[in-house]
């Protein structure tokens, strides 16, 4: 399973989108949390765009019940396009058309919410025997070049799986999966272990896992035989720890901007930050914020 093979380019990505979005109820009672907009663009579109900008051309979205709106968003909308064309709204017509041409997007349903590892496993037939990326929808990562593009380059240079890490305050390490490093590695990028939400004061570092992975397909065999952990879920971290015994996993130390849009405060911050960067909104938003804070 772990014999050396010719390195392949990373062209496929998995975006897990099966969660119930309970933190955003009642807004998510009848719509996917992934479709909640950051101003005028749903959160999941930012994730898809990062994948495409990083060289991904085929994406599988692992969804659940009541997620049809995601499929509709990335599909062609004949009626809307016709309406925009008749109104002469060429700018918006181009934006709407571009959405359906971002990438080849496929869908598979995760029939039960059995954890991130299970969601990744649901895409096994689509991925086959190729290296692949995983992008979590709660994390909008912003950097130039994109985080995933840098990780793919690292994978293609080394042939090793890569996990994105971000430095967090020590008093916040209990909220994240935390990496321990192999001190014998001169690059200090070889991950020795992954500890899921260590107890306060027990973290081996303050480098936390954020929602980007580039993985060898060997992970599927480990996920297939993984034992359910807490709440009966199959955890990706457990199988990554096993993979690390046979094939080195490397860190990509992300230093850009991360928005946690799976958290209410993070969602509000993301909306404000994106608004402040837009020519059509920034001046009025700054004015409003100054008025509110004075």
State where each predicted segment sits.
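Terminal amphipathic alpha-helical/low-complexity segments used for targeting or macromolecular assembly
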Residues: 1-6, 51-56, 76, 155-156, ...
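Conserved N-terminal catalytic core of the sugar/cofactor nucleotidyltransferase
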Residues: 2-15, 23, 37, 41-134, ...
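A secondary-structure boundary/capping signal
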Residues: 16, 136-137, 215-216
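Active-site metal-binding loops of divalent metal-dependent hydrolases
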Residues: 20, 139
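Conserved beta-strand termini and adjacent loop/short-helix elements that scaffold enzyme active sites
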Residues: 108-110, 164-165, 252-254
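A residue-level structural signature of the nucleotidyltransferase/glycosyltransferase Rossmann-like core
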Residues: 132, 211-212, 259
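Conserved core of the sugar-phosphate nucleotidyltransferase
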Residues: 141-221, 226, 230
């Amino acid at each position: 399973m772990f014999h050396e093979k010719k390195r392949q380019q990373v062209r496929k990505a998995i975006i897990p989108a099966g969660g119930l979005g309970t933190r955003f109820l009642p807004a998510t009672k009848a719509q996917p949390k992934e479709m909640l907009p950051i101003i005028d663009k749903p959160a999941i579109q930012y994730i898809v765009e990062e994948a495409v900008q990083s060289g991904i051309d085929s994406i599988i979205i692992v969804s659940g019940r009541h997620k049809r709106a995601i499929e509709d968003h990335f599909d062609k909308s004949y009626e809307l396009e016709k309406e925009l064309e008749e109104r002469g709204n060429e700018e918006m017509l181009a934006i709407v058309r571009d959405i359906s041409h971002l990438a080849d997007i496929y869908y598979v349903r995760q029939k039960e919410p059995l954890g991130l590892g299970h969601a990744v496993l649901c895409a096994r037939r689509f991925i086959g025997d190729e290296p692949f990326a995983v992008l979590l929808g709660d994390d909008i990562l912003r950097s130039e070049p994109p985080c995933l593009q840098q990780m793919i380059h690292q994978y293609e240079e080394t042939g090793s799986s890569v996990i994105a890490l971000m430095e967090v305050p020590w008093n916040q390490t209990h909220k994240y999966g935390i990496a321990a490093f192999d001190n014998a590695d001169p690059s200090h990028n070889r991950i020795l272990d992954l500890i899921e939400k260590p107890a306060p004061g027990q973290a081996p570092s303050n480098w936390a896992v954020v929602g980007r992975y580039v993985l060898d397909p060997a992970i599927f065999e480990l996920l297939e035989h993984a034992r359910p952990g807490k709440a009966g879920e199959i955890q990706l971290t457990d199988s990554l720890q096993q993979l690390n015994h046979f094939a080195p996993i490397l860190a990509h130390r992300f230093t850009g901007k991360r928005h946690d849009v799976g958290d209410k405060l993070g969602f509000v911050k993301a909306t404000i930050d994106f608004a402040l960067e837009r020519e059509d909104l920034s001046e009025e938003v700054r004015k409003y914020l100054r008025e509110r804070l004075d």
